[in-house]
């Protein structure tokens, strides 16, 4: 039986969240819908308007439209928006990343406003992109919102700490079991657990796709469930659907590279996906690691090359 899809209430209080559609679209990876909803919604207070703008600009970041964020968020903007701008600067300026991280380190060493959840999320995102998951986790542990917990779970799963991820998920479920983020985090953990939990994870991704929209995030989640169950051809069909939506989406291309190997596709098929990934995301960690492995192989091959 599929899990329930969350309703538009916040924190189990029964209070309707004016920004539910904006947040929900962002969480499932429907970034253009998030932007459209944010521009349409009428809000009851300036605080809610800042919160709306945070999700609006984060959606632009997810679309790699860094210039929009850098142009529109001014020095006089709210602290939450300044945090989004900081992440935009990091993503947009590869040659300035070290100095941005140093400045962030200085800021973190001072007294941080832990009620500014957006700052904690953006700081953790910078640390994680900078290959410093420990600093990202330390930052997130200062917050107690669902987004901080969900990001903590993502990082713990990447570190193969399923035990800690399950504990964090329990905290999310205690806070709001039916929230979209809790449902997604449950699917991620179930995917890592494997076995009979794979079908439960698939149901969550499928239910959210049916109810909301079959986004790239949800389609890749479904494909991961199929792959983990050995249903490679079914996974390929789902990933092709994702590729039709965005031919340069990194997770889709990486999953297709792995899938092609399992299906015994000709080398040129795998190389084509790899070339697409390089064209769209030359600095992606997968590409960097792949090229490092290629260089290692070339060095080893040279050692065993016959001497003239």
Curated annotation (Swiss-Prot):
UniProt similarity note: Belongs to the COPE family.
Protein name: Coatomer subunit epsilon
Known role: The coatomer is a cytosolic protein complex that binds to dilysine motifs and reversibly associates with Golgi non-clathrin-coated vesicles, which further mediate biosynthetic protein transport from the ER, via the Golgi up to the trans Golgi network. The coatomer complex is required for budding from Golgi membranes, and is essential for the retrograde Golgi-to-ER transport of dilysine-tagged proteins.
Keyword Endoplasmic reticulum belongs to the record: no
Organism: Mus musculus
GO terms classed as biological process: protein localization to axon; protein transport; retrograde vesicle-mediated transport, Golgi to endoplasmic reticulum
Post-translational modification: Phosphorylated by PKA. Polyubiquitinated by RCHY1 in the presence of androgen, leading to proteasomal degradation.
Annotated Pfam families: Coatomer_E (PF04733)
Domain of life where this protein originates: Eukaryota
Annotated GO CC locations: COPI-coated vesicle; COPI-coated vesicle membrane; Golgi membrane; nucleoplasm
Bilayer topology term: Peripheral membrane protein
Annotated compartments: Cytoplasm; Golgi apparatus membrane; Cytoplasmic vesicle, COPI-coated vesicle membrane
Keywords from the named record: Cytoplasm, Cytoplasmic vesicle, ER-Golgi transport, Golgi apparatus, Membrane, Phosphoprotein, Protein transport, Transport, Ubl conjugation
Phosphoserine sites (modified residues): 13, 45, 99
Subunit structure, interactors included: Oligomeric complex that consists of at least the alpha, beta, beta', gamma, delta, epsilon and zeta subunits.
InterPro entries given in the database record: Coatomer_esu, TPR-like_helical_dom_sf
